[in-house]
Amino acid sequence: MGSDLNITKRLQDYILKHGLKLHPVQKEIINYNLKLGDIKRMQISISQCQFLHLIIKVSKIKKVLEIGTFTGLSTLSMALALPDNGEIIALDKNKETNKIAVNFFKKAEQNHKIKTIITVSYTHLRAHET
C-alpha cells in the first residue's frame, strides 16, 4: 500500500477525527518508524490502518496472507480486527525488521494470531502452489 494512495487532506482529517482509535502499540510502531528516516516510507498511513481493520472486521475474515511486514503496523492493524482464532501468515525477507515486528505483536498480545516467515515471498509462494 505505502504512501501512493492519494487521500485528500479533508478526507484524512475526517478519518482521523471519526475513525477507529489506534491501539497503544500501533502508536508505538508509528513513533518507532519516525526514527528510521526515509525507510519509514514503507509504513502504511493511519487511514490505511483503519481501512484494513474495517475490511477484516466487516467481512468477518479469519485468515490473511500478508506479503511484506516491515515493522508490523499493517499486520497488527489486521490482527486486532481478527477473531481470537484468526490467523495471519506474514512473509518478509528482512530478519531485522521481522524481529522488531514480532516484539510489537507480543506487546499487543496478538502474536498468537500471527505467524511470520522469513523468506522471499515470490519463491515461497511458487514453492507452495497447488
Name each model feature, range by range.
Residues 46-119:
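SAM cofactor-binding core of SAM-dependent methyltransferases
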